[in-house]
């Protein structure tokens, strides 16, 4: 494989310098919603965050097929064994304060309560892995909602909020891919199949993980043993494997 094009990101949506604070890398939070502008000569676009890697090429095939059939192909952050990501603070018995990621971010970004409530408990869409066609209506919807989110909200995470609103509020035609196409290690660590040298889902039938994503770091639990076959003896087999700088 080789790199054919490298483009320098721009501020595709104007934001005040008070929000940027010399963090030019935040351009990437906006520029991914404008990929066809930077690379116009392609039919399909696949985005994979730099803290994720392809463990099984089947995930790439599904990303391509998914965006060819619908406007967007993406994974919902919900799977058997995933940590509870719907935070709610209860008081006085039946009253509660909703603290989900989508709800909090929507309110902070100036979206009305109707929209915030609609996405509050919708399975979060992690934007670290997705695909879209060049002519997908998703680009315009995403950019519209991103511009709104940036008008009052913070830069970091706004592109994720915008895509969630595009899908759950605007009704963007979406192919929801298996969790193996964007396995979030901070929610549930995988197992490692030593015989085939591949990461697999920790629950039966231990399917191969397509793309392993370190979003949010690593689920912090002591003495984790990722071996699928406990009879195999390996000295510190995963030391440093999940280290992030």
Region spans (language model):
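Glycosyltransferase catalytic domains, chiefly GT-A lineage
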Residues: 1-245
């Amino acid at each position: 494989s080789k790199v054919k094009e490298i483009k320098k990101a721009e501020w595709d949506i104007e934001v005040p310098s008070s929000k940027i604070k010399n963090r030019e890398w935040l351009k990437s939070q906006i520029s991914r919603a404008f990929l066809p502008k930077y690379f116009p000569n392609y039919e399909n676009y696949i985005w994979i965050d730099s803290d994720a890697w392809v463990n099984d090429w089947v995930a790439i095939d599904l990303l391509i097929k998914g965006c060819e059939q619908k406007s967007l192909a993406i994974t919902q952050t919900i799977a058997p064994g995933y940590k509870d990501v719907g935070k709610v603070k209860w008081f006085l018995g039946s009253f509660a304060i909703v603290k989900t990621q989508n709800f909090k971010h929507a309110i902070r970004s100036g979206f009305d309560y109707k929209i915030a409530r609609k996405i509050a408990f919708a399975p979060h869409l992690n934007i670290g892995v997705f695909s879209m066609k060049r002519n997908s209506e998703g680009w315009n919807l995403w950019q519209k909602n991103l511009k709104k989110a940036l008008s009052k909200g913070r830069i970091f995470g706004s592109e994720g909020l915008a895509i969630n609103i595009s899908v759950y509020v605007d009704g963007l035609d979406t192919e929801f891919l298996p969790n193996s196409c964007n396995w979030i290690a901070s929610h549930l660590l995988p197992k490692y199949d030593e015989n085939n040298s591949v990461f697999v889902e920790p629950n039966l039938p231990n399917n191969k993980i397509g793309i392993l994503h370190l979003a949010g770091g690593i689920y912090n639990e002591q003495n984790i043993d990722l071996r699928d076959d406990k009879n195999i003896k390996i000295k510190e087999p995963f030391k440093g494997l999940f280290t992030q700088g």
